[in-house]
From Swiss-Prot:
This is Lipoyl synthase. It is found in: Cytoplasm. Belongs to the radical SAM superfamily. Lipoyl synthase family. Its EC number is 2.8.1.8. It comes from Sorangium cellulosum (strain So ce56). Disulfide bonds: none annotated.
Amino acid sequence: MAQFSPKPEWLKVRAPGGDTYHHLKETFRKLDLHTVCEEARCPNVGECWREGTATVMLLGDVCTRGCRFCAVTTGDPRGAVDVREPEHVARAIARLSLQYVVMTMVNRDDLLDGGAEHVARTVSRLHALRPDLLIETLVGDFQGHMSAVDMVVDAGPDVFAHNVEVVRRITRVIRDVRSSYDQSLAVLRRAKERQRRLAADAAEAGAPAPRRLTKSSIMVGIGETDDEVLEALRDLREAGVDIVTIGQYLRPSSKHAPVQRFVEPETFAAFERAALEMGFLYAASAPLVRSSYKAAEVFVRSLMDRGGAALPASPGAAAVEALLEERLAVARREAARLTAELDPDEPRPPVAPAPASASPARLVPAASLIRR
């Protein structure tokens, strides 16, 4: 693909703006908070900030790794850590009146624990200040140190996220040499095992079992094949991942890996269907979807609000199938409604009515990711 191939229409977004966007931008400046939305030049920054959603980056804005897709600054922080950051960030986020917050981090290979204790302290402090707040942590691989993974999970984030980023074959070409596809899978597998252990311990003690999820993300259009994407989805599901997001890779600059193809929206829809059929609790697959995209956050909130419907103990449980069927029905109805909005003259097949047991208002189908 030519270096300066124009973006297709479905990848064009309006410029950032709006009162909420400017308020958040000013608030982050005043509170001295780094956001990955800006550091990584996310194309959704305008939309997410208008909706009052943002992803805060911990441990500074210099990453020790140099992946070929990432716009975050690479360097050597030389062990520098702001020990006041957990308290500062927790208090700052608590002031923003958010329902859901994503906290990510730069890789810190210069620290013995990769920054795990720092992240865990921030989560714990934020829980203390805002026990009603749902927290997602998007972390690195901690160089494969599972004790670091345990430390973050034990702090109690509602969602533990770690991205495989790309399919297996091109991992060594696209990601930093210190990253590994299998190591990322091992981190996700360990996080799910730890979540299940904590839930079992709580149940044994007669306490409510915490609802915890794992999440990962894949970029496409960077040299993979469709079959390799499906293979990566199977690998993630085998590792116990609950939520997956798939989005188009966009080149941050001429120094980064070139875009190999612009994946059609129909192909993204096929990836999403395949993921749901594999048993993921949620799959968001569309050109502008990113790991921290707000629609996935809304789904987590809806899932956590499902009354007494606890998460299944194993991926093959009947509860997963029932939940999947319910969500698919909602997604079909939402897709039909959206099609009617976009093209009212287009004939459409009849859509089955909602079953009496369904709760459409609490479910967020991935059709809501399509940009209007």
